[in-house]
Swiss-Prot record:
Transmembrane segments: none annotated. Belongs to the class-V pyridoxal-phosphate-dependent aminotransferase family. Csd subfamily. Catalyzes the removal of elemental sulfur and selenium atoms from L-cysteine, L-cystine, L-selenocysteine, and L-selenocystine to produce L-alanine. Keywords: Pyridoxal phosphate, Transferase. Coiled coil: none annotated. Its cofactor is pyridoxal 5'-phosphate. The modification N6-(pyridoxal phosphate)lysine is found at K242. This is Probable cysteine desulfurase. It catalyses: (sulfur carrier)-H + L-cysteine = (sulfur carrier)-SH + L-alanine. GO terms for molecular function: cysteine desulfurase activity.
Amino acid sequence: MDYGKTLTQSLLSNGADKRENKMAFNPSVFKQHFPYLQQADAVVYLDSAATALKPQVLTDATIAFYQSAGSVHRSQYDEKQTALFEQARENVKNFIGAESEETIIWTSGTTHAINCVARGLSHQLHPKAEIIISEADHHANFVTWSEIARQYGATLHILPINEQWLIEEQDLIAVLNTNTVLVALNMVSNVTGTEQPVANLIKLIRQHSHALVLVDAAQAISHLPIDLQRLDADFIAFSAHKLYGPNGLGVLSGKRHALEQLHPLLYGGKMVERVSAQHIRFAELPYRLEAGTPNIAGVIGFNAVLEWLSQWDLTAAEQHAIALAEQCKMRLKNYPHCQLFLSPQPSSIVCFVFNGIATSDIATLLAEQNIALRAGEHCAQPYLARLGQHSTLRLSFAPYNQQADVDAFFSALDNALALLD
């Protein structure tokens, strides 16, 4: 399969167009933009699915903000910071193909964004209402919608995933009906890297119901070109830290008419236009969903990251990360007792176990050799139950990784397995 043409990428050709005509990708040059990787004691970082490392531009922009005076949207003296703050909305809009800057809502992360939708739509829930999620979901989706359904007496359908970890179209069609209020879809799994055929699934949802659709793009945002308008999702959620941005910042976006259906999750300053003892009038989007002082430093830092990313050929960058991961999968197949959980498409994530050896033991021995990978449930216990596992090991590659990282991992793995034999 062509690394540049996974299921959603082939359907979202406009999104791919945004990644063309960029600076030629060179992994060694790209790596130089990440201060941590220049440190002599840096670990071999193979955990980018958890969080991406941070480029120098993020640090520079954040420091510059904290060395300035003022906030945003407050007075004339903070016009420069306000301009950068709002420019970030425009850059996010362009990056994901959203309708307008007004449909870019700042949150603290993907989980917060999903809860904004869940709580914001609670006025539409009742005992006859139905919600659909799947075994493929991260806890941010799974737990949130499970709890909302329980609180409001709605029916929750949990779609199974097949042996390729994909949602079957017939399973989705079977539970769609006029009572379906919302369908939550995970675009890319943080466990196996499997990409769900989200565009096709949304078409089926439109054909068989009037449900709103929420796409969890936390893992997809740094790997797939997204064109939200062509995707036709009502809501999309992701975190900045997965895309080289700061922690504590996320985005909720979607169709204006869908966002306008949401009741605010939080109430307070900056989300109102008029307040009196008799009446409160909420502000228009995006501010009505952004109560309180925003994460200004985070937004301005993320803006700098998006400006920096716009220089790179991100399709070539992703192909580089995938090639390293696919090499690891091929090499791991030669190890006795190694069980791989492979996505049906090439992916920058490698999920595996060694049967009979605790994942924590391997991870500990690798950490002692400066190899950083993930061992555990990956905040996806239902997904791991489907894999028949309580814990797995996960390698996740990014464009700043090099061939030397792969070689270092296998050298450390051989040492660890020798000790555990």
